[in-house]
Design a protein with these regions (language model features):
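Transmembrane alpha-helices of multi-pass small-molecule transport proteins
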Residues: 26-80, 105-109, 158-163, 179-196, ...
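Specific transmembrane alpha-helical segments of multi-pass solute transporters/efflux pumps
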Residues: 16-17, 45-98, 134, 214-232
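Hydrophobic transmembrane alpha-helices of multi-pass small-molecule transport proteins
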Residues: 44, 103-104, 120-139, 156, ...
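Juxtamembrane helix-entry segments on the extracytoplasmic side of multipass membrane proteins
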Residues: 1-3, 25-34, 60-67, 137-159, ...
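Helix-helix packing/entry segments at the starts of transmembrane helices
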Residues: 8-10, 35, 97-104, 166-186, ...
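Specific alpha-helical transmembrane segments that line the substrate/conduction pathway
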Residues: 31-42, 82-119, 156, 234-253
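Hydrophobic/small/kink-forming positions within alpha-helical transmembrane segments
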Residues: 14, 18, 45, 75-79, ...
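Glycine-/small-residue-enriched transmembrane alpha-helix faces in small-molecule transporters
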Residues: 1-35, 84, 142-169, 188, ...
Length: 291
């Protein structure tokens, strides 16, 4: 499972931006977020109940300090990150470009973790960043960069980076953490939806988007992310985010026919090389944040 987890995570997570773009044709941002969070919460509560019934000894109640940390991570990942992520795509910015912005996470994570980074690792991180810059430059003639979209994308980047780093310091079972975070996020997002007056057109297409984002991404991919972060550390996992733009561009092209320039493909290839070699030189143990 540990070897398969990164590939499953990349496939599910990278499809998210395109599925959000698809679903937002039938729903407002906050209605989509609220519905997604509600379905995810129900799934996680059911999974937690089944798991705790079969293996009660493996799930222990968190301390007050641990619970506060879990809820802070939930606010960052389930509320802030997803809200900014959806808002960025709603501005019309390409899903591929949103994921390119999020691809900067591996550069931020080692510094937030106060981690020793070797010259070789730093060179590979900078190589990955160069690949992202090349890809964005290649896409600038194809897709107009919406200013608000970029701002929301950067806000999403910092939200998921801080959330992932803090998640690495949580020792509670990943299923318990995910359930608590979802229980926190759902009433917040539903409350915002009521205040702004969102709407949904219930079509088969929207239901497919909702199920994929609720079950596939928000439950499946999030549990995989938490599992990998706990096993490998935040810095090692964050480098996977370099690969997400490549797959996101592919999904965007397959579903919406979005064109990809040769320069963007070259940038993607550079990013892929950086990932392959970085994974061969694992980082030193992360110094946990918020001890």
């Amino acid at each position: 499972m540990n070897k398969l987890a990164p590939f499953l995570f990349l496939f599910i997570w990278s499809s998210g931006a395109v599925v959000v773009k698809f679903g937002l044709q039938y729903a407002s941002v906050w209605s989509f977020l609220a519905a997604r969070s509600l379905v995810s919460m129900c799934c996680l509560i059911m999974l937690f109940w089944l798991y705790s019934y079969r293996k009660p000894s493996l799930i222990r109640s968190p301390s007050k300090t641990e619970l506060r940390r879990i809820l802070v991570v939930g606010a960052l990942l389930q509320v802030c990150y997803l809200s900014f992520y959806f808002l960025a795509i709603d501005t019309g910015i390409s899903p591929g470009l949103v994921t390119l912005i999020l691809g900067l996470q591996p550069l931020l994570t080692p510094f937030l973790c106060k981690q020793q980074v070797s010259r070789r690792q730093l060179a590979l991180l900078l190589l990955g960043f160069l690949g992202l810059v090349i890809s964005i430059y290649g896409a600038k003639d194809i897709t107009q960069l919406a200013a608000y979209g970029v701002v929301f994308g950067i806000a999403a980047l910092f939200s998921i980076t801080f959330g992932t780093v803090l998640q690495a310091s949580i020792v509670s079972h990943v299923l318990l953490s995910a359930m608590c975070q979802s229980v926190l996020a759902t009433p917040i997002l539903m409350g915002i939806n009521v205040l702004v007056g969102g709407s949904i057109i219930w079509t088969p297409e929207f239901l497919i988007s909702l199920v994929w984002m609720s079950v596939g991404v928000s439950v499946g991919a999030l549990l995989l992310l938490m599992h990998m972060t706990k096993q490998d550390g935040a810095s090692s996992v964050s480098v996977l985010f370099y690969a997400i733009p490549l797959l996101a561009y592919f999904f965007d092209y397959a579903l919406f026919g979005t064109q990809i320039s040769l320069l963007t493909i070259v940038g993607m290839f550079v990013v892929a090389l950086a990932i392959v070699f970085y994974r061969r030189f694992p980082a030193e143990k992360v110094q946990r944040l918020a001890r």
